[in-house]
Amino acid sequence: MANKILTPITLWSDFNDSLPIQCTVLEEREEDGVLLRKLRCFGRDVGGVRVNIFAVYCAPAGETAPPALLILPDASQTADVAFAERFAKKGYAVLMPDYRGEWENCEEYTIYPEAIPYANYRSAGRRLDFADDTAKETSWYEWVAVARYCCLYLRSLAPERKIGLIGIRAGGEIAWQLAATFEGIACAIPVCAGGWRAYRGVHKFGESTELKMDDERYRFLAGVDSQAYAQYAKCPVLMLCSTNDENFDADRAFDTFARINPEMDKTFYFAARYNGHIGKTGLNDLDLFIDKYLKGREVFIPAPVEIGVEEDEGELVARIKFDRNGEVKYCDVYMAEDNLDSPTRDWTKCTLKREDGDDEQLFTLNAYENASRVFVFAKAKYSCGFAVSSKIAVKRLENAYSNSQKKSRILYSSTNGTDSFTIDRFDRNVLADCFLNTAEPPVRLTEGPLGIRGVYSSYGLKFFRINDARFRPGENGLLKFDIYSPRPTILQVCIGAGQGGTPVRYSCALRISGGECWADHLLSAKDFKSEINKPLSGLNAARYITFYSQDEFCINNLLWL
């Protein structure tokens, strides 16, 4: 069997899911109308030893057969009771297993047989990203096997009820495999997951876009990577992705979406500027999607936005086309320039130029005059409450346009609103380490002294614009900004710098005196130090900049000199 290339069909065709599950309830309680169980059940047999699955089960108290959800967390996470309870309160029976395996200072985990130590996430090693033998001898095979037996457990409780899938990051990759190979799934929602793990570090639009192939890569691509499973999807699919995801190339997200079985309902949404996280708009999409396919609610699911880049009256524009079957409430278009590295792109909002009938709009793309290409995507929200996005469109720029922009030293002023800023730290109000669950805008304008407003986030601010050629500081540039903080605080200013791979963080701690006044600060590269106290070589090496304080503050007039 070694070196055999297995496809999604051949990999799972002989899987034995006929073994008895034998569930044991470890703990059971009822609170606020929700039944909570912690349980163990058996998974597949490995050399005469069964996988011992730990999971959390939540359901509306007193209901016998509500529609069910299998929620698969990220590989570094475990069952999240709060997240499971959220859906139980909405009328779903939820099973959320641990599949990461043995974990420090944790007793509630899935126990894998000694023959497959790589099923434990911390011991996965090469089995996570390589199929050195076959796709069966990988961590993914064992994790999908856990998920299959979890589905069997849910089915054993109520054989006729519908089962939906939600998978987060690595859990989303598992969901792709399950949606393609397990009969009876009613809908699947992979979150920040869409395959192409074999292509990590290979930019879709770079000079060298081809992967160096050998037998091992063929085995991984054929039997593990999620894009191989998309064409076999047996249920409706909602893809939720984030544009600045460090672990998944946003440029390739729509490639996976396009491969989904055309006979299945499907749609797509991008969380703008987020890194492996989804905001309340995407969470609302998720709720509507499962309501439709698990509860039978009448919900209009729009098709993804169509987008193209063209010239109009001498200007560079994006043409947006909407689903004619729905009523659009608003549309936002985002543009980035030149940067092939999708996690560090500066996505800036574009201005509506005009409407062309009921179903088309044109947005101006005010690109830098020396930019060689633009990246553009759109997202639209419909009156039904559902929001969808387009693919990331790319166009090489070979002509001059009347709306081209000159180089600028002004990175930000409050006239820009909150444009280009995102969250630095997802450290609270986050469900399942992924969904930002807050009613207020996470990045907003707040008023400071003299009626002057600045940008603020209690999660800290992150800003990629300093990485754009149009705004990039000179070799000996200085960073200047105004800050308002009503009380004394320490502001952590960090710059991520370096070429290729994960940027190195260089930090500067500023003591802010506080008070009802704006204070200006001027920083040079040498003010920023790495963890080993190495100074930043120059601001022109910056790929992003962040501002964070435990106290309230706001920033304005960010520029370089």
What are these regions (language model features)?
Residues 17-63:
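N-terminal cap/lid segment of alpha/beta-hydrolase-fold proteins
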Residues 54-57, 65-74, 94:
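Short beta-strand element of the alpha/beta-hydrolase
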Residues 85-88, 93-142, 195-204:
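Cap/lid segment of the alpha/beta-hydrolase catalytic domain
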Residues 148-212:
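Primarily recognizes the serine-hydrolase "nucleophile elbow" in alpha/beta-hydrolase
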Residues 233, 239-241:
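Short beta-strand/loop motif that positions the catalytic acidic residue
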Residues 291-330, 335, 348-358:
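Surface beta-strand/loop "capping" patches
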Residues 454-533, 548-561:
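Extracellular ligand-binding interfaces
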